[in-house]
Amino acid sequence: MKKLLVIDFREKIKYEDAWDLQKKLHDLRVKDTIYDTLILLEHFPVITLGKFGDEKNLLKTKEELKSMGIDFIRVDRGGDITYHGPSQLVGYFIFKVDGVKNFVLKVEKSIINVLHEYGIEAKESIEYPGVWVEDRKITAIGIAIKKRVSYHGFALNVNNDLAPFSYIIPCGLKDKKVTSILKEANFSPPMEDVKRKVCLSVVKEFGFDSFMVFNFSSCKELSNFGMLLEDL
């Protein structure tokens, strides 16, 4: 049986805490201590810049961001610069990976399936990573792979404030706009419904037989996660 573990945070999580969690779970996955794991959450406002990103794509000073309550963090994922914040669904994939290109395509297809269910004609782009509605980006994707195990993932705009994207050149792409489910479908689905649809779509695209969801409010609650897995 090919199982998927889903860690679902019901409260907003600081980016640094989620990053530390990914590293710990990545080590466990490399050792085959855990199954492939999908983390679903919302972040407090933060702008992240990928390892090959250009800081020139940040249009505000770090002091200005701080005054607005937005953190700025350099990270080791692919991609350039992006924004995370409340009401945006972020998913981190701690998966064994055989081929990078095929893996990214499956991530994109997983999100596209969900958006189609909401009546949004989303698609992938041959030229740029992520998920698009015409020339508007609705989902950013940035992946890192180490020892054949992935981390980082996607950020799907649900009904989040899009104004902070004007503080950056999203993903380093000039003249490209961002959008959200709310903007495209004229309604805002409950976040729990979006999460459920994402889980089902990931199961389908990656060929899992089943999935198990564990709900948490903070990263500290995961201290006994390894012990819990031993009982599965």
From Swiss-Prot:
A Pfam family cross-referenced in the UniProt record is: LplA-B_cat
Gene designation: lipB
Protein name as annotated: Octanoyltransferase
User: What reaction(s) does this enzyme catalyze?
Assistant: octanoyl-[ACP] + L-lysyl-[protein] = N(6)-octanoyl-L-lysyl-[protein] + holo-[ACP] + H(+)
Residues the record annotates as the site (Lowers pKa of active site Cys) are: K137
HAMAP family per the UniProt record, alphabetical: LipB
Please name the PANTHER family in this protein's record. LIPOYLTRANSFERASE 2, MITOCHONDRIAL-RELATED, OCTANOYLTRANSFERASE
Annotated family = Belongs to the LipB family.
Native source species: Dictyoglomus thermophilum (strain ATCC 35947 / DSM 3960 / H-6-12)
Q: Which residues form the active site?
A: C171 (acyl-thioester intermediate)
Q: Which EC number applies?
A: 2.3.1.181
